[in-house]
Amino acid sequence: MTSKSVKITDIIPQRKPFVFIDSLLGCDESSAETSYLIREDSIFTENGVFQTPGLIENIAQSAVAKIGYVSKFIEHGKVTVGYIGNVHHLIVNRNPEVGETIHTTVIFGENIAGIQLCEAVVRAGSEIIAQSSIKTAQDTSMPVDD
């Protein structure tokens, strides 16, 4: 996996306060890894705990970060708006707390008619705190303004 040093908002369509990854740690043809520091001021933090919808969005943004990186820096195209198509087999062992850094690994499966199938694992340290299958889609007719 190759390490990537890029500004996250250059490779995902989301903007603050709806950004739930801090860095793309690496990516290759079949996977991506991101990190995110859980913050008190996150819209998905409640009573010091990052809630499940935030974990889902973190997983989706982790998938889209790799897609955006390839689009912008390899294909020299634009980052486009993406959608969560389906979340399947979501298991949350625990929700992370403020101050913890989570690492999300996404393994890319088939891409069927523009629908990207992925498997994701979210860790805090060596502990698996969540995992899921997810489907995402990119709307190539809706590029994000730089």
Regions found by a protein language model. Give the residues of each.
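Active-site helix/loop of acyl-thioester processing domains in fatty-acid/polyketide metabolism
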Residues: 51-76
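Short aromatic-glycine motifs in intrinsically disordered, low-complexity regions
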Residues: 5-15, 79
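Short, conserved beta-turn/loop elements at beta-strand boundaries and strand-helix junctions
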Residues: 27-32, 64, 111-115
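Catalytic strand-loop segment that frames the active site of acyl-thioester-processing enzymes
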Residues: 16-51
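Hydrophobic beta-strand-centered segment that forms part of the acyl-chain substrate-binding groove
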Residues: 67-103
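Beta-strand-rich interaction surfaces with strong enrichment in secreted/lumenal proteins
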Residues: 9, 21-23, 47, 91-95
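Short Pro/Gly-enriched beta-strand edge/turn motifs at strand-loop
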Residues: 2-8, 100-104
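HotDog/MaoC-like acyl-thioester-processing domains
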Residues: 97-103, 107-146
